Amino acid sequence: ITAVEGLGIEGPALQLGDPTAPLQIFRSRDVPCAEYDFYAFDAGSVDVYTYVLPTFPLHADRDFRIGENTNTDTKYSVQIDDGALATPSSSHVWFESVLRNCAVNKSTLHIDKPGRHTLRIRVGDPGIVLQKIVLDFGGMKRSYLGPQSTLIE
């Protein structure tokens, strides 16, 4: 994992792995992974928005997909992208992502109980550049680049 200064929406971005590395099975423990702790006050659904740099597939079988699954009671994985685009250069979604300089993807997770949890971002397609993660527990207002970052140390 490499922090790339000035590439993120609000500062540095994370490059998860080497973009020229071969495809990997995302469930493998060897894939690039970033984890973020968060606290949920209630059980229920949470929408996870990932903002990633829009990129073209480097290999024909590459699809920028991460599976969405619950790893344990408190660890969750999300899908970074919606999959391969047959012709990304002519896709409306691709066009909007390039104009915004990020592709915004949404996954919905179910939180079983209140408390501390961990969001795990794992990639089977190394090289994805993660710019921002937003957790919406309900009531988030729509905006072009999402809400401002909240950092609690």
Functional labels for PLM-detected ranges:
Residues 1-153:
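Extracytoplasmic
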